[in-house]
Each structure stands twice: as C-alpha cells, then as structure tokens.
Amino acid sequence: MATSISTQRGQVFIGELPQDFLRIAPTQQQQQIQLDAQAAQQLQYSGVMGTMGRLSITVVQAKLAKNYGMTRMDPYCRIRLGYAVYETPTAHNGAKNPRWNKVIQCTIPPGVDSFYLEIFDERAFSMDDRIAWTHITIPETLKEGKHVDEWFSLSGRQGDDKEGMINLVMSYTSVPAMMPAQPVVLMPTVYQQGVGYVPIAGPVYNPGMPMIASPPAVNPQHQTQEVDIQSIKDMFPTIDPEVIRSVLEAQGGNRDAAINSLLQMVEDS
C-alpha cells in the first residue's frame, strides 16, 4: 500500500500505487457505448446461419449471327457470378456454331439472383475479342427442383438480342451456409486524465482449435558444416575433429581453404 509524504514539491506517493491511480471511472454513457461496441463485434463475427445455392450451368452450344474472325473464329464463354469468374474451354474453329458442353458448378452467395455471360473470340497475336454478351436472371423455378433447358438471346455489335442465341441447361441445389466464428478481442476501456490510453492486445487463440507447436528449425549451414567436417576427417584421420571444426570456422566455412590450412599444419609438424 502506498503512503503519502510531503516534500518541497508537494505531496507524493511512495510504494505500490493503487489500481485506480490517475484513472477516472467511466460514466454510464461511456459504459453503454462500450457495451454497444462489443455487441456489434459479436454480431459481426459470430457464426451466421443462412442458405446459399449451388448452381450447375451446362454451356451447351451457341448459334452466332456473324463470324468476326479474319480466317477462323475460336469462341469461348466467360461467366461472372458474384465475385467469381468461370470460363469454358475454347471451341477451336467453332465459328458461328461453337459447341462446348461444359458443366460449371457455381456457388450463389446470398442476395445474388443473376449472372453475366460473355463470348470471346480467342486471338493468338492480339487481345481476345468480345463478340457477344447477355445478362441472365436465375429462374425462380430452379429453386423448386426443376431443370431449365433454354436458349437465351445474345447482344453485341449487331444490336441488343441480335447477336445470336446460346443454349444453357441449369439446375439448383440449396446448401447450408456457415460462416466460422472469429475470435473477438474485448479489451476494457480505461479513461485516464489528460492521456489517451490504447489497450494493446496480445495474441489471441480460438479455444476451439488446438495449438500446434512448430517443429524446431534446422540450420542447413550447421548440417553442411557437419558433412564437411566428416569428409575432412576422412582425409586427416589423425587430426582431432574439434581442431578440424575450429579451422573450418576460422576459414568461414570454406572447405578448400580449411584443407589447405590443415595441410600446412601437417607439413609444419
């Protein structure tokens, strides 16, 4: 317990300081703000249950209005769904009637109800040329367990819905979505007179995951040195290994320089 004594400069504390030294207890409003912030963090990082869909899109074929290639046209499809991008293989020399028969498995995040499809002509010596595109809304009938096999109009240089058509087969599967809970650091707020105090959090480990100790690192230089010592020992069997080690370290690990030094030692002896 600290004791108070008077000096020429005023009253000072001697000994262990109290826990509330130079600290002001938070008001009810400050406590409420802190609790609200903690609740917001818990809502943000806690596991959120919901549903998300898995959409299967079979890109069958297309019937295009025009061949934009100089000698041939090698079309491929690109699908953008949410933040993900999927592509089909190139239908080499597919021209106006490319066939892909490519099945693409897409995960539909919550809130996404459409995807964007583009057709490109693959070029060998220049950038690929975009020749057709369309925006497709995912049919609601898919969520009822039905399959959709339809032709969708394509837009392009010929105009809206005038660049041809593409055949897609779609099916939908609902899967549960679980976001893993994240560890949350809740540090007490300390209010200090005249000084801003920012709590520093140490490492936080999720109690649900066991800590795995990392294996000790092996120094490759040490292994190399042991190999060199053994090989030099075979050349100089009468010299103590510790002497060889000392000479090798003195030469900075240079094996040839160490051998020359040992030869000089043997000749001098």
From Swiss-Prot:
Residue ranges annotated as motif AIM2: 151-154
Domain C2: 35-152
Coiled coil: none
Motif (AIM1): 133-136
Occurrences of domain CUE (ranges): 224-267
Main location: cytoplasm
Keywords linked to the UniProt accession: Autophagy, Cytoplasm, Immunity, Inflammatory response, Innate immunity, Repeat
Gene Ontology BP annotations: autophagy; inflammatory response; innate immune response; phosphorylation; ubiquitin-dependent protein catabolic process
Family matches, as InterPro entries: C2_dom, C2_domain_sf, CUE, TOLIP_CUE, Tollip_C2, UBA-like_sf
Record GO terms (molecular function): ubiquitin binding; ubiquitin conjugating enzyme binding
Subcellular location: Cytoplasm
A GO cellular component entry from the record: cytoplasm
SMART domains linked to this entry: C2 (SM00239), CUE (SM00546)
Record PROSITE patterns: C2 (PS50004), CUE (PS51140)
Highest taxon, organism lineage: Eukaryota
Disulfide cross-links: none
Subunit structure: Interacts with ATG8 family proteins (via AIM motifs), and ubiquitin (via CUE domain).
Written domain comment of the UniProt record: Both ATG8-interaction motifs (AIM1 and AIM2) are required for the association with ATG8 family proteins.
Functional summary from the UniProt entry: Component of the signaling pathway of IL-1 and Toll-like receptors. Inhibits cell activation by microbial products. Connects the ubiquitin pathway to autophagy by functioning as a ubiquitin-ATG8 family adapter and thus mediating autophagic clearance of ubiquitin conjugates. The TOLLIP-dependent selective autophagy pathway plays an important role in clearance of cytotoxic polyQ proteins aggregates.
Record family assignment: Belongs to the tollip family.
Protein name in UniProt: Toll-interacting protein A
Organism from which the protein derives: Xenopus laevis
